């Protein structure tokens, strides 16, 4: 059993390691393409946006004025009157808030439908998050290492939770998925040690390998509540302290995504 688990861990974490090797620093504005512009809100916070096809925009970077207790309100529209820009904010891009330890709260507008890779990874003082009802997907490692994140409201339309999305969210106590959820990625809630309650909607189609591995507070028999029709990865709820504290287990969110 341990040999198979070790192999699964190695394969899963190798993917994250390889991805990290090619990721750029989101703090380097020079990496951004020329079609990115910014707006400043009334509080003096700067939001950088990338225009999408149609009339949409994706938030790709945030620079806040506050150095602590920062409460972010993401605008629903990207407006630069001097340039004639007025677009709907439809997504939060990769690493947009990566490592922003000053952030304690984020308000996401109803217009947003997706959260990108590592968008809030390492926001170590973020305590709760509420997704709008139109949210469809949460990207890989989106909230990895948000170790004070205690509550998450998933809205009513969510379809997918990406790989390692809530990796090491050790304060998270309960997860209630909407009936629309289809997929839970690999290691999505890995080492959420306080997680004591989770529901699986009837329409769930797949749960990835190690999705709830080392969730020490989950009750026995929780795996039996996954719909019989759902495809299940290996070692979903395995708890093995000796194996999981070896050097082979590395953090998939150590480097910011591009």
Residue map of PLM features:
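Positively charged n-region of N-terminal signal peptides that target proteins for export
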Residues: 1-10
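Short, surface-exposed, low-complexity cationic segments
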Residues: 59-64, 71-72, 95-97
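Hydrophobic core
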Residues: 9, 13-17
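Intrinsically disordered, low-complexity coil segments
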Residues: 27-28, 52-56, 64-66, 80-87
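GGW-centered surface loops in extracellular recognition modules
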Residues: 37-64
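Sec-dependent signal peptide cleavage junction
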Residues: 17-32
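Consensus positions within tandem repeat domains that build extended binding/scaffold surfaces
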Residues: 94-96, 116-119, 139-142, 162-167, ...
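Structural signature of tandem-repeat unit edges
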Residues: 42-44, 67-91, 101-114, 124-137, ...
């Amino acid at each position: 059993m341990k040999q198979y688990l070790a192999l699964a861990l190695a394969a899963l974490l190798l993917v994250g390691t390889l991805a990290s090797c090619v990721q750029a620093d989101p703090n380097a504005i020079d990496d951004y393409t020329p079609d990115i512009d910014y707006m400043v809100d009334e509080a003096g916070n700067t939001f950088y946006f990338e225009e999408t096809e149609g009339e949409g925009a994706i938030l790709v970077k945030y620079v806040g004025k506050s150095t602590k207790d920062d409460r972010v309100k993401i605008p629903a529209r990207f407006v630069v009157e001097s340039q004639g820009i007025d677009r709907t904010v439809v997504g939060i891009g990769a690493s947009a808030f990566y490592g922003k330890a000053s952030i304690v709260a984020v308000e996401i507008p109803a217009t947003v439908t997706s959260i990108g890779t590592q968008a809030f990874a390492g926001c170590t003082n973020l305590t709760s998050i509420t997704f709008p009802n139109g949210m469809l997907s949460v990207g890989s490692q989106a909230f990895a290492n948000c170790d004070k994140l205690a509550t998450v409201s998933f809205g009513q339309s969510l379809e997918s939770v990406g790989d390692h999305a809530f990796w090491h969210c050790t304060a998270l106590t309960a997860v209630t998925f909407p009936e629309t959820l289809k997929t839970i990625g690999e290691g999505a809630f890995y080492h959420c040690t306080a997680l004591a309650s989770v529901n699986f909607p009837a329409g769930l189609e797949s749960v990835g390998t190690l999705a709830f591995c080392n969730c020490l507070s989950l009750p026995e028999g929780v795996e039996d509540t996954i719909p019989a029709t759902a495809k299940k990865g290996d070692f979903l709820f395995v708890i093995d302290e000796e194996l999981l504290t070896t050097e082979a287990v590395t953090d998939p969110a150590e480097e910011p995504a591009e």
